[in-house]
Amino acid sequence: MAYGRLFKEIYQRALMEGLAKLAQVAVVVENIEEVAERWARLLGVPKPQVIETEEWEKTRMAFRGLPSRGRAKLAFFNLGGVTLELIEPIGGPSTWSEFLEEQGPGIHHVAFVVDDMDGTIRKLEGEGGVLVQKGGFEGGSYAYVDARKTLGAIVELLTFKR
């Protein structure tokens, strides 16, 4: 299944106004296959398919304001209203590789699906957040705002074309 369609299916129910509904908690890991197997065992569910983010030519990813070819392997556990995402950086500069390098494996971000990406970024910047990464995927786009100093978390925003 294509990356964008998978995202849209998982988050279709999470479309909302503002940041009222948490859609995802994401964990950066060093070995996604091993960690996904452990989570599957713990949750009593099948291990999800591991997918890779698309190339820069499709994502147009920017990290800290510069084009980046950073990529990652992803796995998603749909836990009802919230998804657990596992992320293994696989090359190039990114918020994922920076986090893993600086802090080791751990909770990387919380995500919300929003209708107004730019307005929500401005709102988070008004709360002391800094846009660190953004890009696209088939059917939508994402942005990471680092608000750890003021909100205690990196916040991911997801939006989908309708």
What do the predicted segments below correspond to?
Residues 96:
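Zn2+-dependent peptidoglycan hydrolase active-site motif and core
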Residues 3-4, 154, 158-162:
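Acidic/histidine-enriched, glycine/proline-rich intrinsically disordered or flexible terminal extensions
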Residues 53, 82, 89-91:
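Histidine- and/or cysteine-centered catalytic micro-motif in compact active-site loops
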Residues 17-20, 28-80, 119-143, 149:
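Core segments of cupin and vicinal oxygen chelate
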Residues 22-30, 74-83, 99-116:
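Vicinal oxygen chelate
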Residues 2-17:
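Short acidic N-proximal helix/loop "leader" segments that mark the beginning
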Residues 25-27, 85-89, 111, 123, ...:
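A structural feature that tracks compact, well-ordered secondary-structure segments
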